[in-house]
């Protein structure tokens, strides 16, 4: 149960998450539930699951896709889902595990008014920061803008923080000043213990951030746009891999850049 709500699930891997009753197959999950929240790794996974769902009777079932993937996957199947009787929105989540646990993550819903209002009610136990931003697909567009700004900020910090080391400025001093002034962002201030090496837990991996970066650039490309700043993230990706930090938290890349005095 989650906040008094019975939660059941199904995983493609067959893994049973702790505390959640899981069904053996997707068909049974659909039969036993009228709300399906998708949280999948990439475009291929979402494509596979949506196509599988289209084989079932979806009348009255709400599909809420929280995955960080191209919105075109859902948009291209909208007519088929509608014909099957489904109600559907894209509703990507912005914020790492700590924000989800605290109920402060952002959820950006794209869809018609009825579907979005219904989805917001189902998602309210997860967070109160829920926004209906526009028609189907705009939820992921909003996440692209929001999380791209975070990526650009962190990339800029990893590029500039070696200057502090070279000049003899302590890392903690630089971070404290940044995070208490106009240049501060929660994505850094909340991670100061991780950056300083006092907290080894991983909120989100560098490889996951790199995957999201690929999605964001793909979405820009769909609208005939590009972002040199987002493309510059490739330097941070290469640096994290070079330092063996691909599966570690982005905070550790900031510390590594300081320690080796190497701009990413």
Where are these regions (language model features)?
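Helical "substrate-binding/catalytic lid" subdomain
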Residues: 138-261
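Short, well-ordered alpha-helix to beta-strand connector turns
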Residues: 4, 19-20, 32-33, 104-105, ...
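Short phosphate-engaging motifs
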Residues: 45, 73, 115, 156, ...
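Rossmann-fold dinucleotide-binding core
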Residues: 69-148
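Anion (oxyanion) recognition and catalysis
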Residues: 1, 82, 124, 165, ...
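Hydrophobic beta-strand scaffold residues
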Residues: 7, 22, 87-89, 130, ...
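NAD(P)-binding Rossmann-fold cofactor-contacting core
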Residues: 1-19
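Rossmann-like NAD(P)(H) cofactor-binding subdomain of soluble oxidoreductases
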Residues: 14, 24-105
């Amino acid at each position: 149960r989650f906040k008094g709500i019975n939660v059941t699930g199904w995983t493609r891997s067959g893994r049973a998450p702790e505390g959640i009753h899981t069904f053996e197959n997707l068909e049974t999950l659909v039969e036993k539930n009228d709300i399906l929240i998708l949280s999948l790794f990439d475009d291929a996974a979402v494509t596979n699951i949506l196509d599988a769902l289209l084989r079932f009777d979806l009348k009255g079932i709400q599909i809420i896709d929280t995955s960080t993937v191209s919105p075109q996957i859902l948009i291209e199947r909208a007519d088929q889902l509608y014909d099957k009787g489904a109600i559907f929105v894209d509703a990507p989540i912005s914020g790492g595990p700590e924000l989800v646990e605290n109920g402060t993550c952002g959820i950006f819903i794209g869809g018609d008014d009825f579907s979005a209002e219904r989805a917001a009610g189902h998602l309210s136990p997860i967070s109160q920061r829920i926004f209906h931003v526009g028609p189907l697909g705009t939820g992921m567009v909003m996440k692209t803008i929001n999380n791209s700004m975070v990526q650009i900020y962190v990339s800029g910090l990893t590029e500039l923080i070696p200057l502090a080391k070279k000049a003899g400025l302590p890392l903690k001093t630089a971070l404290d000043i940044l995070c208490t002034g106009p240049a501060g962002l929660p994505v850094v201030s909340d991670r100061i213990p991780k950056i300083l090496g006092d907290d080894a837990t991983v909120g989100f991996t560098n490889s996951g951030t790199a995957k999201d970066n690929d999605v964001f650039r793909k979405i820009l490309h769909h609208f005939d746009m590009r972002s040199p700043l987002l493309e510059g993230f490739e330097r941070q990706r290469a640096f994290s891999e070079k330092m063996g930090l691909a599966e570690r938290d982005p905070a550790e890349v900031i510390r590594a850049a300081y320690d080796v005095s190497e701009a990413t």
